[in-house]
Design a protein with these regions (language model features):
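N-terminal positively charged helical leader segments and presequences
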Residues: 1-72
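Short, ordered loop/turn segments at secondary-structure junctions
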Residues: 11, 69, 111-115, 217-218
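Glycine/charged-rich beta-loop-alpha catalytic/anionic-binding loops adjacent to active sites
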Residues: 18-20, 77-81, 185-188, 207-215
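Generic structural signal for residues in well-ordered beta-strands
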Residues: 64, 146-150, 212
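RNA substrate-binding interface of SAM-dependent RNA methyltransferases
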Residues: 73-167
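Active-site/ligand-binding-proximal alpha/beta "capping" segment
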Residues: 162-202, 210-213
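Structured adenosyl-cofactor binding patch, chiefly the S-adenosyl-L-methionine
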Residues: 199-241
Length: 241
């Protein structure tokens, strides 16, 4: 049986009821054509999810009655930050979607020496699109926490801000194998653009304490590398069976 999931931020939730906003209400009533009495699920993006019954539907909002709060754990125990160099729009969209499904905590779009970045692009529009993609992926995969999609940063800013836990840079030019990764609960992963990292960027990462890791002898597309790196780190640290 399909589970219909809806997003309601904490401000829309009380102990006994949940109010869905306009977009979620439209999807519930006009797309799914659910009626009062239907059982649905609502999550707050911060780790909580509730089984609910549809109580009332009107043009701009839907009222849900809370039946029970779910207690099973679905989130990753790891705090995973993915610094992904900017690439073509559709490929970056795909990385956001799949990284969300895998359980990433935060995604940081990076400007690097070889990244595809045009200042004329609407930065705010891109951020809003990536956040919508992350929300839809969160609904689909059963997560309860929305990943943070940060504003665009340059690579130096990213390196200087990531100070906790393991800091990893995946490079096509050498690096240790994933088996050398030490246990940690907080991990930052840097993935370069299609043109690769420059020598200056590798030197910067090394100076900031980043460990260079390899994804093997074959050259991967950057979007493939991002997902492979996340999955391997999760497997190595016990997040994947």
């Amino acid at each position: 049986m399909q589970r219909h999931r809806f997003y309601a931020p904490p401000a829309q939730i009380t102990n006994a009821s949940i109010t869905l906003g306009n977009d979620e209400s439209h999807h519930l009533a006009r797309v799914l054509r659910l009626l009062p009495g239907a059982v649905v699920f609502a999550f707050d993006g911060e780790g909580n999810e509730y089984e609910c019954e549809v109580a009332q539907i009107n043009k701009t909002k839907t009222e849900l009655n809370v039946i029970a709060q779910l207690s099973d754990e679905v989130e990753s125990p790891l705090q995973l930050t993915l610094g992904q160099a900017l690439i073509k729009s559709d490929k970056f969209d795909w990385v956001v979607q799949k990284a969300t499904e895998l359980g990433v905590t935060r995604i940081v779009p990076l400007i690097t020496e070889h990244s595809e970045f045009r200042k004329a692009d609407g930065r705010e529009q891109r951020l809003q699109r990536w956040r919508r993609i992350a929300l839809e992926a969160t609904k689909q995969c059963g997560r309860r926490k929305l990943p943070e999609i940060s504003d665009v940063q340059n690579f130096q800013q990213f390196c200087e801000q990531q100070t906790a836990g393991q800091r990893l840079i995946f490079s096509e030019r050498g690096g240790s194998g994933i088996a050398s990764l030490a246990t940690a609960a907080t991990i930052s992963i840097a993935i370069g653009p299609e043109g690769g990292w420059s020598k200056a960027e590798i030197d910067l990462a090394n100076a900031q304490g980043y460990i260079a890791l390899s994804l093997g002898n074959r050259i991967l597309r950057t979007e493939t590398a991002a997902l492979a790196a996340l999955a391997l780190v999760q497997y190595q640290l016990g997040d994947l069976p």
